């Protein structure tokens, strides 16, 4: 049964001649890791902003468990590419910040924050300052903070895009471990093709001008990793390589088509 439903969503910004998204329908169910991939201008971030409630669609409707999405909510936790951490707070304070705003008692919110830090392999980092953390550690703190409020859905906006290749792979593997342990549905957007194929249970490919879904793929590579298979074995699997090349070809064909349309 779908937890999150988007029905024929379109989005057009004020003053824009064309919509950024047109006629998008999708569902996100329990234990699903849905990844949106597409070239620049395909509306990936706009789609996530709609689901998060940061902006409203110009047409269609979005529902979470049958209730219309109207504005941001703790039920939809968001992890950004920019870690957006509070430099005046230590690690524990950052993870517990949303719970503090919600009025949760100090002992309970700090216990929950420590639990989430352990989940992302940062046990013992409570008193570290943000400036003392690496890029990957900052993203772990951001993930722990989003999970601390126990959201129904986790939304991730190119969360590993600013990391080096080695740290990015570590974070991908950590995400799959967290996803398996929490069983929370995840909606993630990325521009990295290998990342999309590795993580997704369901992959949607978006074409630009306006953003539309042009292909949907059901994949199991991330599930295989979560079940204990090594990332190296999965990524050397001929089926993984074939899928990655197929997706690469589709993305480049969309980019080429867009460039031809933009030529005078």
From Swiss-Prot:
Keywords of the record: ATP-binding, Cell inner membrane, Cell membrane, Membrane, Nucleotide-binding, Translocase, Transport
Please list the residue ranges annotated as the ABC transporter domain. 4-233
Q: Which InterPro entries match?
A: AAA+_ATPase, ABC_transporter-like_ATP-bd, ABC_transporter-like_CS, ABC_transporter_ATP-bind, P-loop_NTPase
Give an example GO molecular function: ATP binding
The answer to whether UniProt assigns keyword Coiled coil to this entry is no
A Pfam family matched by this chain, by name?
A: ABC_tran
Q: Does the keyword RNA-binding apply?
A: no
> Where, by residue number, does ATP bind?
38-45
- Where is this gene product found? Cell inner membrane
Q: What is its EC number?
A: 7.6.2.7
Task: Name the chemical reaction catalysed here.
Answer: taurine(out) + ATP + H2O = taurine(in) + ADP + phosphate + H(+)
Which family does the UniProt entry place this protein in?
A: Belongs to the ABC transporter superfamily. Taurine importer (TC 3.A.1.17.1) family.
Give the protein name, as stated in the record: Taurine import ATP-binding protein TauB
Task: Write down the species.
Answer: Pseudomonas fluorescens (strain ATCC BAA-477 / NRRL B-23932 / Pf-5)
């Amino acid at each position: 049964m779908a937890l999150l439903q988007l029905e024929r969503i379109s989005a057009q910004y004020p003053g824009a001649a064309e919509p950024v998204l047109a006629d998008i329908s999708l569902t996100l169910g329990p234990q699903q890791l849905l990844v949106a991939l597409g070239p620049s201008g395909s509306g990936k971030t706009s789609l996530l902003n709609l689901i998060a409630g940061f902006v409203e669609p110009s047409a269609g409707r979005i529902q979470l468990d049958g209730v219309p999405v109207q504005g941001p909510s703790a039920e939809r936790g968001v992890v950004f590419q920019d870690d957006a951490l509070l430099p005046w707070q230590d690690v524990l304070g950052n993870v517990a910040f949303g719970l503090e705003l919600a009025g949760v008692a100090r002992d309970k919110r700090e216990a929950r924050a420590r639990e989430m830090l352990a989940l992302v392999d940062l046990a013992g980092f409570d008193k570290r300052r943000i400036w003392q953390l690496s890029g990957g550690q900052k993203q772990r703190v951001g993930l722990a903070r989003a999970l601390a409020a126990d959201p129904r859905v986790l939304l991730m906006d190119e969360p590993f895009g600013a990391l080096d290749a080695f740290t990015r792979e570590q974070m991908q593997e950590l995400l799959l471990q967290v996803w398996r342990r929490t069983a929370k549905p995840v909606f993630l957007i990325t521009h990295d093709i290998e990342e999309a194929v590795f993580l997704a249970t369901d992959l949607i490919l978006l074409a630009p001008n306006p953003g539309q879904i042009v292909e949907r793929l059901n994949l199991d590579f991330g599930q295989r990793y979560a079940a204990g298979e090594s990332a190296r074995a999965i990524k050397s699997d001929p089926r993984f390589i074939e899928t990655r090349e197929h997706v690469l070809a589709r993305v480049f064909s969309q980019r080429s088509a867009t460039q031809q349309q933009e030529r005078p």
